[in-house]
Amino acid sequence: MKTFALALGGGGARGLAHIPVTEALDDLGVKPAAIAGTSIGALVGAAYAAGMRGKDIRRHVIALAHNRGEITRRLIAARAGTLADLFTGAFGQATQLDAEKFCAQFLPEAVPQDFAALQIPLTVIATDLHRRQEAVFTSGPLRPALAGSIAIPGLFRPVAIGSGILVDGGATNPLPFDQVRERAGVTIAVDVFGMPELERNDIPSVWESMFTTLQIMGSAIAAAKHKHAPADLMIRPNVTIFRMLDFYQASAILRAADAVKAEVKEKLGALLAA
């Protein structure tokens, strides 16, 4: 049987749709030879590479999503600054999140501190802000790399690793199937950007406008890459109706994405057996 590599893209809360894909792999009884992830895809990828089963990742997410008080407590603990910063001119510090603290608060305990402790090789994608290029992490401290990968400008404070200042990996490689193409015989990519919403004509909030713009940019980058050198299997869960920060709707997102399980099992199974 052929080997396969798995690429999980960014997309905020829509990225919870990666979880049913991992459950489908568990149902098939197969594991990827390598995983690459950007932003939320890096977080799910890290949990899966650490040895968690898809159903256990789902259980962790739902337990948090159904406890708003606990989410609020953890978000407060993950702030980059304090309320006092509002009155000392450091407004951004008070309103932004610290991505490393966020990972410490929300990642499952099974996710280790170092890449070396993972059961499956993992590639994490971030963006080096000042060098204006993709930053690729495959070894060393894991959680700082994950923090850099999720550091959406405006929401998170940029993350410093070595001489690099990192922001969200979606700015340079939102769906990193190219990073694992040579690692296996088959490459599967999971696109959670969503489809155009032709029936909408409402004026979105400031945050939604910004995040949707990032999604459009990411989708365009991924589409261009796929046209140039496509992944062997592209999976697109139907999660368009959800917004980037709809984490409280985790159960609904997972239900909507469950439909891809059959597609993954049928199409990937055929590719691996060919």
What does each of the following model-derived ranges do?
Residues M1-T38, A46-A274:
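Patatin-like phospholipase
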